[in-house]
Every structure is written in C-alpha cells, then in structure tokens.
Swiss-Prot record:
InterPro entries: DNA_helicase_Holl-junc_RuvA_I, Hlx-hairpin-Hlx_DNA-bd_motif, NA-bd_OB-fold, RuvA, RuvA_2-like, RuvA_C, RuvA_C_sf
Gene Ontology cellular component annotations, sorted alphabetically: cytoplasm; Holliday junction helicase complex; Holliday junction resolvase complex
Gene Ontology MF: a single term: four-way junction DNA binding
Region Domain I, annotated ranges: 1-64
UniProt region (Domain II), positions on chain: 65-139
Signal peptide interval: none
Pfam families noted in UniProt: HHH_5, RuvA_C, RuvA_N
Region (Domain III): 143-192
Identification of the protein by name: Holliday junction branch migration complex subunit RuvA
Quaternary structure annotation from Swiss-Prot or TrEMBL: Homotetramer. Forms an RuvA(8)-RuvB(12)-Holliday junction (HJ) complex. HJ DNA is sandwiched between 2 RuvA tetramers; dsDNA enters through RuvA and exits via RuvB. An RuvB hexamer assembles on each DNA strand where it exits the tetramer. Each RuvB hexamer is contacted by two RuvA subunits (via domain III) on 2 adjacent RuvB subunits; this complex drives branch migration. In the full resolvosome a probable DNA-RuvA(4)-RuvB(12)-RuvC(2) complex forms which resolves the HJ.
Domain remark in the UniProt entry: Has three domains with a flexible linker between the domains II and III and assumes an 'L' shape. Domain III is highly mobile and contacts RuvB.
GO biological process, one term: DNA recombination
Amino acid sequence: MIGRLSGVLLEKNPPQLLVDCNGVGYEVNVPMSTFYNLPGLGEKVALLTHLTVREDAHILFGFGTAEERNVFKQLVKITGIGARTALSILSGMSVADLSNAITLQEAGRLTKIPGIGKKTAERLLLELKGKLGADLGAAGGVIHSDATSDILNALLALGYSDKEALLAMKQVPAGTGVSDGIKLALKALSKA
C-alpha cells in the first residue's frame, strides 16, 4: 500500500493531481477541500493516500489531513458508497460538517451533495452513527460521543436551533457528563 506521497506538484486538474516523486509521476484524486489548500505548481506537496485496487485500475486518493483519510476509509466500507462517491462527499462538506450531520441525524444536509439521494443519505446516517465521533472531535471543535448526542438532543428538544446547539457544544469540554454538559451548554446559550 502507498500511505503517503511527497514530491513536486506538476499538474492540478480538479479533482486530479500529478505529483512527481523522484522521477515517477503519480496521478492522485483529491477532495476539493484538499485541492483548495494545495501549493502552487512546481512546489513541494505531501499527501496522505489511500490506494484502491480494482480489476482494471489502481487508483490513488490523496488527503491533506489524517481525519479526511480516516473518514474516506469509513465511507468506502459502506455498501453502495464507492471511492468516487466518498470523494464527492468529502468535496461537498468538511469533515466537521459531516460529523455534525451524522451526530444530529440530518439527512437533508447530506442530500445537498451531488450524487447523494435520500436513501443513500439515510444509509450513511445509519452506518456512520457512533463511528465518526472519536476521529472527528478535534476537527470540528465539538466533542462527539454518546453524551454529546444526548446533550444535543436535549438542546434541540428545548427549542434551540441546530446551529445554536452546535455553537453551545463548543463550550462543553470533552468527557463531560450529560447533566453537566447540558448545564454548560445552557450557560453558553444564555450569554449569547
């Protein structure tokens, strides 16, 4: 397996790159979030990669962060979600946004991504619930655990919007229990 590429960026044609690694040019497909953060042509670039082997091709997918690569790996494990669809999902929303959509069970946010219909969105919510939290907590500044889900559900039940609830969750330290988390979140909301 090829886990990382480091070399000179020769071409950028979204979503594909050509990276020269000591005289060998690797074609790498990247999500748009990674693409927008690339250096200019002729500059050094380092990407974490995932190699997909098919009967007719070996395809490299590159990522700017370990979180993106981990989420990609989780996505391709889901029945009906191929590597191209997983790349489209990561191009359509950030890792933190995807985590929050999964935590809040918001299929509507997922269906806004091209190629993701209602059934696919519901499958994503079902398959990823509880799997992404540990990987993505640091990415979005919000903890993601069973306690988080309970706290978020409590805030939503009290009539706060998704946005307000997520902003309040940023004030709740990781590992906080449900009752203390609700108190801290409500305190943060009262100050807003």
